[in-house]
């Protein structure tokens, strides 16, 4: 199985690590923006050294209470980082739901659009469908980032999320997008209770029946804090544990902050697999 993207046909014959890059601008001044972009690009280089297979660059935080970032601010934060990252030799994903940002980063050579709204914003589907080859990750989110936890989902969570993702993929395919360009993300932490998030993990293998690769994003999520009592900056170990559990249950890609630790843990996991080679 391969994931077709703008510049790469990404083999999914082993678990891949997607490293998170924060490109939120510190200020609108040129100096502040340049300094932030330089730090983000240095972080990209470090993540690649640590073993990241894919970079995921985002200019807007989806956490509740995070300051709003408008279109101009997001473009100012993301574009300089994408411009530099596309020459680093690995696929570049951009975490955005704005069609204007999607179009701009694809014009710069970005490979993947990673959208928490699953292309539900007006014009977003058309941007992806009109591109000849970009990859896309469609995520499930209940409601929106500001209200998703005020009234979480109820009922059969696995069935609802599966149905949403399948319908989203089918809608995109109906616009001419080939299925091998699509990856699905159940959306851990986006409008679900702690119990529901872990239910998605426990039943994650059921999503594989729909025929699309899966991305799992457990890194530093509040559900990990709920079961460990650890603050967000102390959640590296549970994040790695969740990534391993997700891979064990069939996830093809794990989206993480702690790339080096996740890669090391996956090396141990891989060594224990049947017919594993112990030499990297």
Residue map of PLM features:
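SAM-dependent methyltransferases
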Residues: 1-15, 280
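Active-site-adjacent loop and "lid" segments of alpha/beta metabolic enzymes
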Residues: 12, 29-43, 62-81, 87-91, ...
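Hydrophobic beta-strand anchors of alpha/beta hydrolase catalytic cores
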Residues: 17-18, 55
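Catalytic-pocket segment enriched in acidic/His residues
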Residues: 25
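Catalytic domains of carbohydrate-active enzymes, especially glycoside hydrolases
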Residues: 42-58
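Short acidic capping loops at alpha-helix termini that bridge into adjacent secondary structure
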Residues: 178-181
């Amino acid at each position: 199985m391969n994931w077709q993207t703008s510049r790469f046909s990404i083999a999914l014959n082993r678990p891949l690590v997607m490293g998170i890059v924060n490109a939120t601008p510190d200020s609108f001044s040129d100096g502040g923006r340049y300094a932030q972009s330089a730090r983000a690009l240095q972080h990209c280089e470090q993540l690649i050294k640590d073993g990241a297979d894919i970079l995921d660059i985002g200019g807007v935080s989806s956490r509740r209470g995070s300051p709003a970032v408008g279109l101009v601010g997001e473009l100012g934060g993301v574009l300089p980082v994408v411009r530099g990252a596309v020459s680093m030799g690995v696929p570049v994903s951009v975490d955005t739901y704005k069609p204007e940002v999607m179009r701009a980063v694809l014009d710069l050579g970005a490979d993947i659009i990673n959208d928490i709204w699953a292309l539900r914003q007006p014009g977003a589907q058309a941007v992806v469908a009109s591109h000849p080859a970009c990859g896309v990750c469609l995520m499930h989110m209940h409601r929106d980032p500001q209200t998703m936890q005020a009234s979480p989902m109820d009922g059969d969570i696995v069935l609802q999320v599966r149905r949403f993702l399948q319908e989203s993929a089918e809608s995109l395919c109906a616009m001419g997008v080939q299925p091998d360009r699509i990856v699905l993300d159940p959306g851990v932490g986006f409008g679900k209770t702690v119990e529901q998030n872990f239910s998605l993990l426990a039943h994650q293998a059921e999503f594989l029946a729909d025929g699309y690769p899966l991305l799992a994003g457990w890194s530093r999520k509040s559900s990990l804090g709920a079961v460990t009592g650890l603050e967000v900056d102390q959640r590296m170990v549970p994040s790695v544990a969740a990534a391993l559990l997700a891979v064990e249950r069939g996830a093809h890609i794990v989206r993480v902050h702690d790339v080096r630790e996740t890669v090391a843990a996956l090396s141990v996991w891989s060594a224990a697999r049947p017919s594993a080679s112990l030499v990297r």
